[in-house]
Amino acid sequence: MKSVRYLIGLFAFIACYYLLPISTRLLWQPDETRYAEISREMLASGDWIVPHLLGLRYFEKPIAGYWINSIGQWLFGANNFGVRAGVIFATLLTAALVTWFTLRLWRDKRLALLATVIYLSLFIVYAIGTYAVLDPFIAFWLVAGMCSFWLAMQAQTWKGKSAGFLLLGITCGMGVMTKGFLALAVPVLSVLPWVATQKRWKDLFIYGWLAVISCVLTVLPWGLAIAQREPDFWHYFFWVEHIQRFALDDAQHRAPFWYYLPVVIAGSLPWLGLLPGALYAGWKNRKHSATVYLLSWTIMPLLFFSVAKGKLPTYILSCFAPLAMLMAHYALLAAKNNPLALRINGWINIAFGVTGIIATFVVSPWGPMNTPVWQTFESYKVFCAWSIFSLWAFFGWYTLTNVEKTWPFAALCPLGLALLVGFSIPDRVMEGKHPQFFVEMTQESLQPSRYILTDSVGVAAGLAWSLQRDDIIMYRQTGELKYGLNYPDAKGRFVSGDEFANWLNQHRQEGIITLVLSVDRDEDINSLAIPPADVIDRQERLVLIQYRPK
């Protein structure tokens, strides 16, 4: 009966966090609008081999993540939930692997359930796992690969070992098809310390080639298909998207070595109080084979991405699966022996909630700031933000009432965030970061436009997805579409600032021409170097400028 209650509670938890509130949040640009539009175009064109964005070749990532996203929109429609359905599914599958692996290691159902809940409620997991990017997919394949490797190394027969390594190769292959060759480097780095300490080199060398073969066979069909269709894909993807992004001096998203320290700290909420103890207990118990495996799986990718020049918080998502297992194991031991860490965790959550309440007041219309984040007419959004932090502090306090039994309720600290964050985003943020909001405000003007031009790829993708058209033209800036725009068949998809006046004269009689520009909040739009317009509609950070036929 208790198991049934736990399962009902888990399903309610998943529904409240990962299902019910998702549609209330508009898509963020540039990431969510980009991936939403790529998948929409894939469904519309029927081309499941070559990814396109705004009708242009888009070679920043391979194809598998787009497949899953496209299936999500096919099943649930072109809406906010449909766009995010794929990442939510991947996150829940990863949580299922956390459950399975914890059971495999410790044979404890309660521990497995707690590890799952901890994983799903970690701030970084929830933030990325409900956000339409490709990282939850690669995290799933990496976690599946680590589970497969463990399965192979624990098998007692050659058939079991062979099956495990074949499965490892398939997961690595799917990882390559999702985000590239990092899906090969990360698992290898993660298992090497464990293989070395356990002296398991023999099994690795005997059966490892099976993983290589299955990985190649997994990638080969699509790899050959896209090489035939687009011979330049692999050169661009390997050199630009791997070498330049991570290793060269001009790498994208450059950050210092310590970049991931605050990411891990913030990402570990609402379980931050367990982080030091979980890692220390794991190190102290390093003679235990499974603990070494989890530690290596947590730390090695973190070190690898810290050394790389290009860094983003999403890169280390897969590290939090083993960390959640270590935290759950440590928390149960602490509850029995010394609940100090659990009390500290409760106080951290209270402090975080109270700090959030104070910060919300400071940036509210009633605070001391001259330019508040929310305007007076957005009072309900301020109260939503207060509710988010109040619930966080409340559940932090509740875990302290009987800490040995109530500590798992820390998983409910982000409940207010899950349910209310979509209602608390300030208009000034929505106007710049949510193209759907802009489209809703200017729908009547945008819909009949013969041509739409914009200077932001993220806004362009949002306009294309909302209006169901992929012919948005880039104006002044090419951004990440620079490579696709270099192809001969992309001629006419970019208009420079100097060329715009002539281009306008040539195309004005064909229909309404709409220019959507990103501007600074205090920028005078009358000073823009553009021909006089028939309509100007400013929505704070985005401005619609329209030219009608003469």
Curated annotation (Swiss-Prot):
It is a multi-pass membrane protein. Keywords: Cell inner membrane, Cell membrane, Glycosyltransferase, Lipid A biosynthesis, Lipid biosynthesis, Lipid metabolism, Lipopolysaccharide biosynthesis, Membrane, Transferase, Transmembrane, Transmembrane helix. It is found in: Cell inner membrane. One of its GO terms (molecular function) is mannosyltransferase activity. It is an enzyme of class 2 (transferase). The chain crosses the membrane at residues 7-27, 81-101, 111-133, 137-154, 165-185, 204-224, 263-283, 288-308, 315-335, 346-366, 382-402, 406-426. The keyword Mitochondrion does not apply. GO terms for biological process: lipid A biosynthetic process; lipopolysaccharide biosynthetic process; protein O-linked glycosylation; response to iron(III) ion. Its EC number is 2.4.2.43. Pfam families: PMT (PF02366). The keyword Membrane applies. One of its GO terms (cellular component) is plasma membrane. It catalyses: 4-amino-4-deoxy-alpha-L-arabinopyranosyl di-trans,octa-cis-undecaprenyl phosphate + lipid IVA = lipid IIA + di-trans,octa-cis-undecaprenyl phosphate. Pathway: Lipopolysaccharide metabolism; 4-amino-4-deoxy-beta-L-arabinose-lipid A biosynthesis. Belongs to the glycosyltransferase 83 family. Catalyzes the transfer of the L-Ara4N moiety of the glycolipid undecaprenyl phosphate-alpha-L-Ara4N to lipid A. The modified arabinose is attached to lipid A and is required for resistance to polymyxin and cationic antimicrobial peptides. This is Undecaprenyl phosphate-alpha-4-amino-4-deoxy-L-arabinose arabinosyl transferase. The lineage of its organism: Bacteria, Pseudomonadati, Pseudomonadota, Gammaproteobacteria, Enterobacterales. The gene is arnT.
